């Protein structure tokens, strides 16, 4: 990108597309893009130095502003559908993270997948932390982190957890 007075507005030399699998989180995508950038940067520098680069103006009508994500935006609303909740978990990993509050403690869900259980939004459906969502589907937590503790796989976490089947995790 050529430098322009405004941030991220200059013409670009090359753009690349990548395939994103559904289960990738923000950290995975960042790593994938870093590897692509490392692979392509020398070719792009050569094009510029050899005066072969073709710079194209960006389409500013499709540009969007991305404000900083606040920590509280990571709070999970169990009334949402399972796919949106999984998107929040993946999109906010590793930081600020998607979380819920149970008995006054914050729990960050690090990895989850869509499950088949049904129940009231926020209801714990199994002993392995399957949580009901607002669309009669659920999410199965795979990895979780209790506030101030190390990340844990769900089986290990549930051994000492106060969260049990039938508990309700509210949106409050």
Predicted stretch roles:
Residues 1-65, 72:
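Donor/substrate-binding cores of folate-linked one-carbon enzymes
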Residues 67-80:
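Acyl-group handling in specialized metabolite and lipid biosynthesis
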């Amino acid at each position: 990108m050529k430098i322009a007075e405004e941030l991220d507005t200059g013409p670009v030399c090359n753009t690349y597309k990548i395939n994103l699998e559904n289960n990738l989180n923000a950290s995975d995508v960042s790593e994938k893009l870093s590897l692509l950038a490392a692979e392509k940067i020398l070719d792009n520098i050569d094009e510029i130095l050899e005066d072969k680069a073709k710079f194209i103006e960006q389409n500013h009508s499709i540009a969007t502003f991305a404000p900083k994500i606040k920590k509280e935006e990571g709070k999970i609303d169990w009334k949402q559908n399972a796919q949106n909740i999984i998107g929040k978990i993946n999109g906010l990993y590793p930081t600020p993270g998607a979380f819920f509050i149970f008995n006054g403690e914050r729990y960050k869900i690090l990895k989850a997948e869509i499950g088949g259980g049904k129940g009231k939004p926020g209801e714990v459906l199994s002993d392995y932390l399957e949580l009901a969502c607002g669309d009669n589907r659920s999410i199965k937590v795979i990895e979780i982190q209790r506030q101030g503790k190390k990340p844990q796989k769900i089986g290990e976490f549930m051994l000492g957890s106060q969260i049990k089947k039938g508990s309700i995790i509210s949106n409050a």
